[in-house]
């Protein structure tokens, strides 16, 4: 039995799931909002907030961890320049998930995740 399994599986093997979350995190930081399924949005929230927290820390080790996760190098540098000013008064909750209409093809629950 898998008691207290805290990792959302998202119907994919671990390597594909990690790559998908990295791509979604990169897209969210670049665009500011992403439309995806509700389950993916909830999984994405943890990763995006972790990257913003690293950017607020601003140390060299944090920057290297972010460079190893986010696909775009210039995006990491921009995040580390803007995040400490933008989120200085927040201790968390950098994203907002808003439910939208179900997807037309398979009626999956959809959501918009955006940076606050």
Curated annotation (Swiss-Prot):
Keyword Glycosyltransferase: no
GO CC aspect terms: cytosolic large ribosomal subunit
InterPro entries linked: Ribosomal_bL17 (IPR000456), Ribosomal_bL17_sf (IPR036373)
GO terms (BP aspect): translation
SUPFAM superfamilies: Prokaryotic ribosomal protein L17 (SSF64263)
Gene Ontology MF: a single term: structural constituent of ribosome
Sorted UniProt keywords: Ribonucleoprotein, Ribosomal protein
UniProt keyword annotation of Ribonucleoprotein present: yes
Highest taxon, organism lineage: Bacteria
PANTHER family referenced in this protein's UniProt entry, alphabetically: LARGE RIBOSOMAL SUBUNIT PROTEIN BL17M, RIBOSOMAL PROTEIN L17
Family of this protein: Belongs to the bacterial ribosomal protein bL17 family.
Subunit and interaction comment: Part of the 50S ribosomal subunit. Contacts protein L32.
Protein name according to UniProt: Large ribosomal subunit protein bL17
Originating organism: Parasynechococcus marenigrum (strain WH8102)
The organism's taxonomic lineage, starting at the top: Bacteria, Bacillati, Cyanobacteriota, Cyanophyceae, Synechococcales
